[in-house]
């Protein structure tokens, strides 16, 4: 078994043996966009409008989400330049706080919040695919059985989701270059698809948004703003995935910080422009509570052809998002196995394809099982609290590593230190506290799930 780093502040010594350093800055920037842009931007604004019916405040929420994500990217970029290794955030937590906290991060990510996200996005892909192939709809039940927990059903959409995951696993199995090519093509396609909405709005819009600070029917704007931020943060999640693939970047110390900053800045700009197009396509009354807001906006601007175009864009977007997720998630599993806290076989690299093939298969099989179980959404909700908490703790690593390892080279230092890391920590802390107050059951469940990882860690360490 490979030796594992022991105490905080020790430099990682285990190399990413066998992996191919094939990714440059352009690929890394597109990876940030590809891993973050899934279905959120197409679905969340209508839900936000139901609690915050003001175009100005909704745009402020999206801008605030961009500032939070950018402060996170700037903060983690320093640690990324110090430890340009596969595993990303897992490695930073290990070096700053020790192996147990790093293990708990990987435990939560791989078992629930990341694999559950893959399952949810895959089912979303199948749901939109049913727009052009109705027989693949989630409402078409193929099999059902009674269980002690209730009736377990498997729909056509769940089967399509499993096929989607398997296809992407195969693409990433045969090489990081093939996975990267797919990501580049699909990310460019989804960004072009999103760009069509503002262009249509410029040409065909007949709605003039009410750019007032607060609408008259918003009795508690601050409370509504906080609720809306949950949707924004979800749509901005996964910015950190690019750190997990550092072991396959050609010059990660230079390019990884740049990719985080450029990618998140572009993402924020895209989200703001697309939301502005929604407000020019539909009056606020028609936006409120609408789930498929992009589809409805496109219909208002270009009729049924617009709706079909959006459906195609979402299909491309969700497929591409999961391609990036499988590519990145397997590297986290690989890093944990390399450190001896997961099955050692997952640290193997394919002799021909130079990919962590066992890790790719393991992640994809587990995500497929979650998709078939139908319970991923509930589990995902429970553990997102723990995910936000761990990323907040990870940001403290910048301060801790400056004290523990002042001698370690830092090709990039956080711009605006210490203000920028503090902004992310305070924003994350507010979100964690709000979730704890508003959703105590889910928050406690997330903490309990993390606690279950402690005996698993000690068992893996004793092997």
Language model regions located:
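Hydrophobic, membrane-embedded alpha-helices of multi-pass small-molecule transporters
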Residues: 23-42, 160-168, 200-201, 215-269, ...
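Hydrophobic transmembrane alpha-helices that form the core helical bundles
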Residues: 47-50, 70-165, 170-173, 314-335, ...
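TM-loop-TM module centered on a large, flexible mid-protein loop between adjacent transmembrane helices
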Residues: 91-92, 98, 130-142, 217, ...
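Hydrophobic alpha-helical segments and their helix-loop junctions in multi-pass secondary transporters
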Residues: 126-135, 188-215, 233, 276-282, ...
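C-terminal membrane-solvent junction of multi-pass transporters and transport-like membrane proteins
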Residues: 153-156, 345-355, 391-442
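Membrane-interface loop-to-helix entry segments
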Residues: 156-204, 219, 237, 260-261, ...
